[in-house]
């Protein structure tokens, strides 16, 4: 069965939660701010959401899942992986079954936002490769495909056992 969900930030107020419920939504994907993913904060959010019959079905935090220190194997990588593992452990303690992961050292790269050829009148992120190719390298050099895969394997070797122990699945975005 398909479960329709909406994304929200961990700082969403009651009016937003009520709005989701009025739309008939039951399931929420929560993006946690850095200071909102300790056990007590997550539990409080779950209790507040339960008042609106809403349930967190998956969670992420940009600071731990879009982390160039991890993705590029930079100094401090192991400490950042430990943070991801703490996040995963808390989600498991709170019975949140899925943690998000995006392997994008530079995030989603866009040139600008505007109405484009295929956006049907809506504003969208536009990629202009000519403009992007003129940019300075974001991390000082080009990383090889092999380096990126090696860093991904390094990450998985250190996080999947924690996910399994916590009862949490990792969803790659």
Language model feature labels by segment:
Residues 9-22, 41-45, 79-89:
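Short, acidic/polar
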Residues 1-2, 55-71, 131-140:
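N-terminal small/glycine-rich loop or linker at the start of catalytic domains
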Residues 1-10, 45-51, 68-69:
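Mobile, glycine- and charge-enriched loop segments
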Residues 22-40, 60-75:
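N-terminal substrate-binding region of glycoside hydrolase catalytic domains
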Residues 20, 28, 49, 91, ...:
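Conserved, mostly hydrophobic/aromatic
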Residues 2-7, 26-30, 56-61, 99-101, ...:
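Hydrophobic faces of well-ordered beta-strands that scaffold small-molecule active sites
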Residues 6-15, 31-44, 106-109:
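Acidic-and-aromatic substrate-binding clefts and catalytic sites of carbohydrate-active enzymes
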Residues 71-172:
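Active-site acidic/histidine proton-transfer and metal-coordination neighborhood
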